[in-house]
Amino acid sequence: MRALRSTRLIALIGCGLAVVLVGCGKKDAAFEIITPPVPAVLPKHWNVPEFALTERTGGTVILADFSGKVWVADFFYTTCPGPCPMMSSRLSEVQKQLGTEPNLRLVSISIDPEKDTPDVLKLYAEKFQATDRWLFLTGPKAGIYALARDGFKLPIAEPETPGGQIIHSTRLILIDRLGAIRGFYEATNETGVNDLIRDIRKLLKEK
């Protein structure tokens, strides 16, 4: 009788253990992190519209100057106390890794052109050791705001209070050789700049 009870007890323990193991297996599967695959070909969004702005050197830059080039754009201003220095640091990292690529350009467009004159932009560019392949642009405020909102579809707004911060996007935008936007990357996220560098390399290989 005791032997029978012992056998039943062992069987029950075995079943319980089996249930626990199966349950754990299901739980692990439920919490498994699945990383979405990186697309082999980057999607094409829309084309950047025509523009004409002034570079820190005093020269005029137009959209056609980027024909045949892969370029990365951002909208910033030199007195920004918030994310702009980080955005510029991210582009500096791109320059560090890919700055020798002859068909790559970095383009920082000021959204405070009244203060960000070419001379001011020149001093700012020096802080980040920007080469001549990293352009800093300024120009008419209305045109720049329209370019940000309508051309790149990025939010931008005047300060809510006098002397306040200009509200703007912290995204970096990747544009291909034909002027088509191919991706947006969050500059405040380290993963964003890593993804950007990866995708720049993809576009540089595109014919």
Which residues does each predicted region cover?
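N-terminal "domain-start" segment that seeds a small globular fold
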Residues: 29-64, 89
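Thiol-/selenol-based redox modules, centered on thioredoxin-like
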Residues: 160-207
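Thiol-based oxidoreductase modules, predominantly thioredoxin-like and allied folds used
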Residues: 103-116, 132-142
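Short, internal strand/loop/helix patches
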Residues: 122-169
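Conserved helix-turn-beta segment immediately C-terminal to the redox Cys motif
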Residues: 69-70, 86-109, 126-127
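Short active-site neighborhood of thiol/selenol oxidoreductases, capturing the structured segment around
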Residues: 63-85, 90-91
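Bacterial N-terminal signal peptides that target proteins for export
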Residues: 1-13
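C-terminal motif of bacterial Sec signal peptides marking the signal peptidase cleavage site
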Residues: 20-23
